[in-house]
């Protein structure tokens, strides 16, 4: 038996087949002490790293027709390497998605030497609350559904990566969100897709996003440091991203 705890006259023990109980100290003989160690090997997450500076722009696409503006949008930029069109919304808490992704859009961008990382969001269409994001991400099966559909859509239109823009993550949802990023990163690696994750500017009230862990499992961690003023700000300032 293995001694689990010692008391004044009794010892709590566990047998080899897992049965736990108590025996008197005097009933135990041939006591032997052993140091038990367990080798922990941290999982190695491979990553994709570009050999150039990423200059990424989000393209706010709200309908299929808006995809036709890709040529104009690229022409208005200089030094652009990556477009992140807002194509994907999480439709419901079961993990289904709605998509306006376009293979023609991707094909044109590639001809201009611009990569496409399609953006998936938990707001502005479909689910759009902390409660709904928690209901989605706190279930393994729902995360799996979401990831499966994201990968399938990415491969269908030929994008180079997936950009995650989840802005409705509560404190209690943080651990489930990070598990989602871990699981998605594995599937992205298996399919040669870049994984980038968008974040608020780091503050004490958004530590649940766990940027340190993101940095281990994702390819790129993005800080949305817009030089703009929010709606309702007491001060006047720029509002354009």
Where are these regions (language model features)?
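Substrate-binding cleft and catalytic face of glycoside hydrolase catalytic domains
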Residues: 84-85, 104-141, 150-157, 161, ...
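Aromatic-lined carbohydrate-binding surfaces of glycoside hydrolases
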Residues: 86-91, 120-138, 166-171, 202, ...
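Substrate-binding surface in catalytic domains of secreted glycosidases
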Residues: 93-97, 174-241
